[in-house]
């Protein structure tokens, strides 16, 4: 039995892991992929103490910091659900993905408390599972995924040197995507369904200096076209008239959806599916904490996620001390 299981692999999980190691807890971090949304970020210039870095570098520094404390990180684990047992402990069931070491390490069924087997048993749990990209849900999107449609500019942008591409969205992620693509592609269209951007002014100002970027406002993307690969996209203007752009890449950045489906059904969530937490980062179930973008805390920022991870861990320590 672990004192604590931390589920996730980005800023919140990293901060929680560092503090857990310093408190000498018996714990483990389990995650599908380490790095999370941080690893898919482009330039990062608002992480205190580092004037400028990028997501890949910062994610590696997170990993290095955890490694320096000897923290056990198990990757390739896809958590199915968390259940609180009658004795107050938590049963986590999961499936092993590629690279996971958990395959074949099932614990016996807890006959008096649960009919299901537990892959991990812990006194407390921190959920720091983050978010995943929201989809457009339009014709052509699924058909051309990984064939020109991408949700990660950092990952796939370098595959389009000298090409004509489009970024769809109206927030920071879309602006950052366009800025990155402007240095790679021949032409970048930025498709914003709104009359203005919701992102940071400094990003928009930088984007407006790029000669190969064209911003199209009040444009709702209706379908993505192509043959074997993407060849274009169609959008409707505010009058409903359709226009087609010839592009070879479409980068979708229209927001995120919280990865909150693994928590017990009795856990309170808001209308967006975000886990509701109190000032101690605890859910409405004692011993179950949540941190980072998966929660209802506003302003989704790396530094805020790290702070929440710290808060969740220290709160979990207080909970564990009371259990003794």
Predicted features and spans:
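Residue-level detector of alpha-helix initiation sites
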Residues: 10-12, 131-133, 171-173, 296
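FAD-site-proximal beta/loop scaffold in flavoenzymes
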Residues: 137, 143-159, 252-304, 308-311, ...
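FAD-binding core/adjacent interface of flavoenzyme oxidoreductases
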Residues: 1-7, 35, 39, 73-163, ...
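Rossmann-like nucleotide/phosphate-binding core characteristic of flavoprotein oxidoreductases
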Residues: 1-7, 22-25, 236, 243-249, ...
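A general structural signal for well-ordered alpha-helical segments in protein cores
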Residues: 44, 59, 66, 135, ...
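A Rossmann-like FAD-binding core segment of flavoenzymes
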Residues: 66-98, 119-122, 183-279, 318-324
